[in-house]
Amino acid sequence: MEQIYDMIVIGGGPAGYTAALYAARSGLSVLVLEKLSAGGQMALTEQIDNYPGFEDGIDGFTLGEKMQQSAERFGAVTELAEVYKASLSGRIKTLETSEGVFQGRTVVIATGASPRPLGVPGEEALVGKGVHYCAACDGAPYRGRTVAVVGGGNSAAADALTLSRIAKKVYLIHRRDSLRATKVYHAPLMAAPNVEFCWNSTVSALLHESRLTGLRLKGVNTGAEHDLSCDSVFISVGRAPATELFRSELALDKSGYIIADESTRTSITGVFAVGDVRTKALRQVVTAVSDGAVAVHYAEEYLAENR
């Protein structure tokens, strides 16, 4: 008879492996399904300085490996597999993957959300080499330097404000002639002496040698192009949660995030959503880790009532 796990975690990022650690340490049988490698999006971050315990910071890949090892130390099992189909409504949850079918009494969804790329040639190769998607995560090394932010919504405005406090110069590039961000951001950005707006502009090329050296901007109305020198660009044009698998069963918000409050419980009992994939105000490594621990607390309550 195939094993039925107490908990199956989908996704091996910080939220997923924290859930696995807490559950395994509590004596639950735990399987983590990860399609690539430990760390999730965090693994792409060159330097993490805002996660406690590392006085010199740590790279995301190494931190992801450490989280995996911590969970496996207490008996959690990792399977490198991609989930193709999820049946979550029953008392026993069934997941069909590239490596076979797995069953669990509870499921923790930690599939994350990916930044939407600009789609400019060379973008992927320059990630971590001047191309970034999170100012709070990756902005610190650019203190006193020239940076650019692409986008016009709340996240772009917040990134530009964050960077304006440390960078020598911040270019905010937006394809329209005004910000879509809420009004609370407008006055501080307009008042910042080191923020320059590039309205009605898109990025047509990334200039680089071994690292990013600048951007080629194209006028939306004129089609004219010009080059802009900068040490980094922070792309903030939205995020895409990895929730397509769950659309037919779970309640999602209009942006595709799984609706779950601070308990991490979803619209299906025994199913929890943690980290960047759920509705929440702040998406950071520390908040993802918190979600993982909280999910196990409520999963244990559920298991005690449904054995």
Regions found by a protein language model. Name each.
Residues 5-74, 157-183, 253:
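Beta1-alpha1 glycine-rich phosphate/pyrophosphate-binding loop at the start
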Residues 71-90, 95-96, 101-102, 164-262, ...:
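A Rossmann-like FAD-binding core segment of flavoenzymes
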Residues 119, 125-141, 237-287, 291-294, ...:
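FAD-site-proximal beta/loop scaffold in flavoenzymes
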Residues 78-143, 147, 152:
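Glycine/small-residue-rich loop that forms an oxyanion/phosphate-binding "nest" at active or ligand-binding sites
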Residues 4-6, 80-81, 143-145, 200, ...:
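Phosphate-coordination loops involved in phosphoryl transfer and adenosine-cofactor binding
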